[in-house]
C-alpha cells in the first residue's frame, strides 16, 4: 500500500458516547468483519469490558476502504477508552496516529473527557474530525451540541461537524470519506533504517510478548533480527502481522503501518511500552521520545486469597506488561501474609485490575483500602514518602504532612452549580474558576485526591442527576492535618485495615468503621472487641456479639460455687480465645470502602 493511501487515526470521546459502536460500523462498512462475525462492541473482547460496557484497553484494527475516487485506502483504527482513569491509554494510542475522530453524544453534549481528550490530541498536534453521534434520538439537542463544539474550537463550525448515528449507520459513510480527505498520511521514509514505536503489548503463554508497533521509518520483515533500544534486548521476530481485528500474519510491514511483532521473549519486564524497535543489522541512530510514564494516583494492597503467592506474582507481572500504568512492589502484612502494594490511576482502575486477575489468570485477591501518596517531613528534617499507611511515622516524629491536590474540572448545566459546589465543599474542595461553554458551566476546583478517590464521582452523578462530568489533573502537594487510624480486632492490630484520614474526619469515620466491622468480622464463641486508635488513644470501640450465651447469666439457677466455676472456666477460655487469630474475609476490608 502506498504511504499516501494510509490513514492512522483514533476515536476519542467521553465514556458512553459511542466510540465502540462507531468502530463496529466502520469495520462493517469496510467489510473487515463479515455479517456472521459482527456483534456489538466487537473490539471490547475482555470480560470486564463486556460486563461494565466500557472500553478499558485501546484496540487496533486494519480496514481497507474503497473511496469515492475508486482507489483503496488502508485505515488503521485505534478504539480508545473514555473513562477518566484511562487517560494514559488514550495518550499512548494517539502517539501512534496522525489524526482522530472527536466523537460527541448529541444527547449529552461536550463533557469533561471530551475536553480532556481534545487537549491531549492538540498537544500532539493531531488533525481532528468533529463528529456528532446519536442525532437520531428524540432527546438529541443538536444545536446546543454544535454550539458547544464551536466554543471548544472555533474551527469546529457547524459545516465541519459530521452528524451521524453509529447505531443505525446513518452518516457513517461520510465519516469514512472525511478520514481520507481531512486526515494526513504518515510521513515516514521507507529507505531509512527501521524505526518503530512499541505503543502496546500483550503476553501469550506460548509465543511470549507480542508487541504492538507503529512503523515510523523503514521496513519490518518476518524472522528479522531486531533490537529494543531502551531495553537493550535483541531477538528474532518470530512473526509479524496486523489486526483485522484478529491477528493476521504478514510477510512485511512498511513505514506508516500499524501491526504486531511476536518477540518470543518470555520475561514480560524486558519489553516496555514506549520503547523503540530497530534492526540489529542497520540500527537507527536516534530512538523515539517514547512516553512520560503514567503516575500512580491511588495505592492498595493485593494479597492472594488462597496463599498462592507465585500465581499472583506471575499474574501481576503480565498485567503490568499489558498495562504499564499499573505498578507493583512486594510487601508483607502481619494479617494477610505476602502480597503486593500496587499503584493505580484511580479506584475504577483498581476494580478493573481485580476483575482481570480473576477472569484472565484465575487469581482471587484480598484488597486493602486504597490510599494516596503522602510526603512526610520528620522533626529531624528527613523527608519520607509514604505509599502504605502502615509505614506512616509515629505522630511524635512528624513535623508536617503534605498530600496531593488535584485540579478537578466539572462540566455541568447551570442548574446543577449550587449542588455541585456544596458537594465539593463537603469534600474540602475550593473553587478556582468558573467558565461558560455554551449553555454549560465548567467549574475548576482544587480538591485533595484522597477526597475524590472513593465515592466523589458517584456522588457527583447523584447530585447532578447524571448531567455533570469530571476530569482531573495533578496540581501540587500541600500541607494537611492528617492522622493514622489503626484498627485492633480481638486486641490484635490488623495492619491491612490501617488508613490515613484528615484529623477532623477521624471521629465520625472511626465510629462508622467499627459499626461496619461489627457486622462483618466473623463471630466467635466469646465477644470480640473491635477498636480504632488514633495517636495511641482508642476513639471508637464495639464488641462483635458471641455465638454462645454467657454461661454465668443464662437464666438457670446455680449455686454460688457452680457459678464461680463456670466463670473461671469461661475466663480461661476467653484468655485462650484472645490469642487466636481470626481469619478475615474480604467483606472486612470492604468496610473501609463504604465510609
From Swiss-Prot:
Primary location class: membrane
Binding site for GTP: 16-21, 133-136
Gene Ontology BP terms: positive regulation of translation
Domain tr-type G: 4-187
Catalysed reaction, written as an equation: GTP + H2O = GDP + phosphate + H(+)
Pfam families (alphabetical): EFG_C (PF00679), GTP_EFTU (PF00009), LepA_C (PF06421)
Keywords associated with the record: Cell membrane, GTP-binding, Hydrolase, Membrane, Nucleotide-binding, Protein biosynthesis
Compartments where located: Cell membrane
Assigned EC number: 3.6.5.n1
InterPro entries linked: EF-4 (IPR006297), EFG_III/V (IPR035647), EFG_V-like (IPR000640), LepA_C_sf (IPR038363), LepA_CTD (IPR013842), LepA_IV (IPR035654), P-loop_NTPase (IPR027417), Small_GTP-bd (IPR005225)
UniProt membrane topology term: Peripheral membrane protein
GO CC terms: plasma membrane
A molecular function GO annotation: GTP binding
Similarity comment: family membership: Belongs to the TRAFAC class translation factor GTPase superfamily. Classic translation factor GTPase family. LepA subfamily.
Function description: Required for accurate and efficient protein synthesis under certain stress conditions. May act as a fidelity factor of the translation reaction, by catalyzing a one-codon backward translocation of tRNAs on improperly translocated ribosomes. Back-translocation proceeds from a post-translocation (POST) complex to a pre-translocation (PRE) complex, thus giving elongation factor G a second chance to translocate the tRNAs correctly. Binds to ribosomes in a GTP-dependent manner.
PANTHER family: TRANSLATION FACTOR GUF1 HOMOLOG, CHLOROPLASTIC, TRANSLATION FACTOR GUF1-RELATED
Protein name as annotated: Elongation factor 4 2
Organism: Lactiplantibacillus plantarum (strain ATCC BAA-793 / NCIMB 8826 / WCFS1)
Gene coding for it: lepA2
Amino acid at each position: 500500500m502506498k504511504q499516501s493511501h494510509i490513514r492512522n487515526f483514533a476515536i476519542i470521546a467521553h465514556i458512553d458516547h459511542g466510540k465502540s459502536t462507531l468502530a463496529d460500523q466502520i469495520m462493517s462498512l469496510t467489510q473487515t468483519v463479515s455479517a456472521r462475525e459482527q456483534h456489538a462492541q466487537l473490539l471490547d473482547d475482555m470480560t470486564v469490558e463486556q460486563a461494565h460496557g466500557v472500553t478499558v484497553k485501546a484496540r487496533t484494527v486494519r480496514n481497507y476502504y474503497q473511496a469515492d475516487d475508486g482507489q483503496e485506502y488502508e485505515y488503521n483504527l485505534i478504539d480508545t477508552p473514555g473513562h477518566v482513569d484511562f487517560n494514559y491509554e488514550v495518550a499512548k494510542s494517539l502517539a501512534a496516529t496522525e489524526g482522530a475522530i472527536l466523537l460527541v453524544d448529541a444527547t449529552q453534549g461536550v463533557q469533561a473527557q471530551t475536553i480532556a481528550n481534545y487537549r491531549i490530541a492538540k498537544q500532539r498536534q493531531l488533525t481532528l474530525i468533529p463528529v456528532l453521534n446519536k442525532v437520531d434520538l428524540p432527546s438529541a439537542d443538536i444545536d446546543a451540541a454544535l454550539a458547544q463544539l464551536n466554543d471548544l474550537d472555533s474551527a469546529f463550525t457547524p459545516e465541519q461537524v459530521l452528524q451521524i448515528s453509529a447505531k443505525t449507520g446513518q452518516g457513517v459513510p461520510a465519516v469514512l470519506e472525511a478520514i481520507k480527505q481531512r486526515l494526513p498520511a504518515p510521513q515516514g521514509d521507507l529507505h531509512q533504517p527501521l524505526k518503530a514505536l512499541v505503543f502496546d503489548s500483550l503476553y501469550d503463554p506460548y509465543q511470549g510478548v507480542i508487541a504492538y508497533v507503529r512503523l515510523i521509518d523503514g521496513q519490518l520483515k518476518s524472522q528479522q533480527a531486531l533490537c529494543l533500544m531502551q531495553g537493550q534486548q535483541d531477538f528474532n521476530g518470530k512473526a509479524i502481522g496486523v489486526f483485522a481485528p484478529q491477528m493476521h500474519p504478514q510477510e512485511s510491514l512498511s513505514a506508516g503501518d500499524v501491526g504486531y511483532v511476536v518477540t518470543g521473549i518470555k520475561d514480560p519486564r524486558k519489553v516496555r511500552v514506549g520503547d523503540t524497535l530497530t534492526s540489529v543489522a542497520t540500527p537507527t541512530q536516534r530512538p523515539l521520545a517514547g512516553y512520560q510514564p503514567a503516575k500512580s494516583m491511588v495505592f492498595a494492597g493485593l494479597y492472594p486469597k488462597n496463599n498462592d503467592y507465585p500465581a499472583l506474582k506471575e499474574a501481576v507481572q503480565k498485567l503490568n506488561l499489558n498495562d504499564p500504568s499499573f505498578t507493583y512492589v512486594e510487601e508483607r502484612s502481619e494479617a494477610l501474609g505476602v502480597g503486593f502494594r500496587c499503584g493505580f490511576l484511580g479506584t475504577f482502575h483498581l476494580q478493573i485490575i481485580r476483575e482481570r486477575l480473576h477472569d484472565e489468570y484465575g487469581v482471587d485477591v484480598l484488597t486493602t483500602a486504597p490510599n494516596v501518596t503522602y510526603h512526610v517531613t520528620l522533626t529531624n528534617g528527613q523527608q519520607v514518602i509514604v505509599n502504605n499507611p502502615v509505614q506512616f511515622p509515629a505522630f511524635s516524629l512528624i513535623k508536617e504532612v503534605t498530600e496531593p491536590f488535584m485540579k478537578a474540572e466539572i462540566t455541568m448545566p447551570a442548574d446543577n452549580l449550587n449542588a455541585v459546589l456544596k458537594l465539593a465543599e463537603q469534600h474540602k474542595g475550593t473553587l478556582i474558576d468558573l467558565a461558560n461553554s455554551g449553555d454549560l458551566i465548567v467549574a475548576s476546583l482544587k480538591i485533595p485526591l484522597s477526597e475524590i478517590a472513593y465515592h466523589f464521582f458517584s456522588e457527583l452523578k447523584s447530585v447532578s442527576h447524571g448531567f455533570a462530568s469530571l476530569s482531573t489533573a495533578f496540581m501540587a502537594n500541600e500541607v494537611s492535618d492528617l492522622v493514622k487510624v489503626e484498627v485492633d480486632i480481638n486486641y490484635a492490630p490488623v495492619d491491612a485495615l490501617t488508613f490515613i484520614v484528615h484529623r477532623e474526619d477521624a471521629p465520625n469515620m472511626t465510629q462508622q468503621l467499627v459499626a461496619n466491622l461489627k457486622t462483618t468480622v466473623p463471630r466467635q464463641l466469646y465477644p470480640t472487641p473491635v477498636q480504632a486508635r488514633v495517636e495511641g488513644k482508642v476513639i471508637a470501640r464495639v464488641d462483635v456479639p458471641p455465638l454462645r450465651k454467657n454461661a454465668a447469666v443464662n437464666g438457670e439457677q446455680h449455686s454460688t460455687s457452680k457459678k464461680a466455676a463456670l466463670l473461671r472456666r469461661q475466663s480461661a477460655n476467653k484468655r485462650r480465645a484472645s490469642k487466636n487469630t481470626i481469619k478475615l474475609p474480604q467483606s472486612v476490608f470492604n468496610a473501609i470502602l463504604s465510609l
